[in-house]
C-alpha cells in the first residue's frame, strides 16, 4: 500500500490516475487505479468507487488501453491537453467510446498550439497525402496533421477560443515570439512574480568577471561560434559551441548555487543527439557534480517542459543543415512560423542564451531577424568562442533612440514592382536564400542617392 501525499488537488478534488508505475510521477502512484481500488473487496464496492470519482486522468495511450472504463462510467466532459501533438488515430477510440446506448463522453475540449511541433509521424509527405475527395472536403488532407489543427482551421469562431495569457516567459523573452509567431494572438504575461523581476538572478549578486556581468544584465544573449577548424568533426557536433555551453553552465551554477535545482534552474537544447555527448564531455571537465543531472536534449523532447534558463546550441556547420533545422516551418499570411524555433525559445522562464554560427544562421530570414532583435537589445556579442570562454569580450551597448536623417525620398514605382516580384517572394518563402541575398545587394548598390 502506497502512502498518499498531498498532490496539490487530491485532497480537495479526488481523482484516479489511469496508467502504470513506470510512466507515473512517484507523487501520483498512490492514485493509480489499482491502488485506488485496494479498499474495494467487492465488485459493488468498485462500481460505487468509480461512480463517486468524478475525475480520471491519463495519457491517450493509457485510456485507449482501458476503454472498458467507459462501460462502467459516463463522462460529461473530456479535456485533451497537448492535442496538437496527437494524431487522429490515437483519438478515435476515445472519441467513439460508448456507454450503454449513448456516447460515453458528451463534450470534448481540445487544448493545444498548432504553431509548436506537431505529432511525430514516420510517413513522408507523399505517403501521408490524402486523395479521397470526401476526406479532403472535411479538411483531412495530410495524415500527419492532428485533429486539433484540422478542426481549428475549419471550425467557426464560436467553437474556438484563444488563451491570451501566458505564465512562463518573462516579457523580454516573450516579445520576439509574439512579434514573429503569435502576431495574431499577442500573448500577455499573467503576470506571475518571476515575470515582474528586473533581473534573471537574485538581487545583490556581484559579478566576478565579464561572463557573470553578461548573465546578470541581459535576458537574451547570442554568442557567435565559428565552425571547428578540423575536418574530422561530425556535422552534427560543434566543439566550440559545446565549450561555450559548458562555460555558461559553470557560471550559472556559481550564481545560483544556493538554490540550484537541475530539474528547474537550467536546461540545454540541441538539434542533434551527437552534440549532447560532446556537451556532457565538456561539463565533466568542470568537476561540478550538480551539473551532471541537468537535462540536455532535443527540441522535440523539450516540448511541454520549461526551465528558468534555457541554452540553445544551434550546432549546425553548413547551409544544407538549415533545411533540417527549419523542417517544421509553414507560412501563415505573410509570416513564416518556425515551429521548432518557437518551441526552443518559449521553454525559457527567465533567461535565454543562444550560441551558433551567425554566417550560416543568417541565411535564414527568421534566424536573421532573431539575431538582429537580440543585437538591438544589447545581447549580441562581437566575439569568438575562445575569447568568450576566457571572458575576454566587451558587453554591447547600442543607442536605443535612433536619430532619423532629414533627407527622405519616395521609392519610384518601378523599384517597388521589382522588389515585390523578385525580392519579397524568396524572402517570405525561403525557397532560394542565396538568390534573395544577391538580388537585395544588387538593388541596394544601384539605388539612387536621396538627392537624385
Where are these regions (language model features)?
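Conserved motor-coupling elements within RecA-like helicase/translocase cores
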Residues: 31-53, 301-307
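Conserved helicase motor core of SF1/SF2 NTP-dependent helicases
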Residues: 4-13, 47, 61-62, 69, ...
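Conserved two-lobed SF2 helicase motor
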Residues: 52-62
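Conserved small/polar residues in nucleotide/adenosyl-binding loops
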Residues: 1-5, 445-452
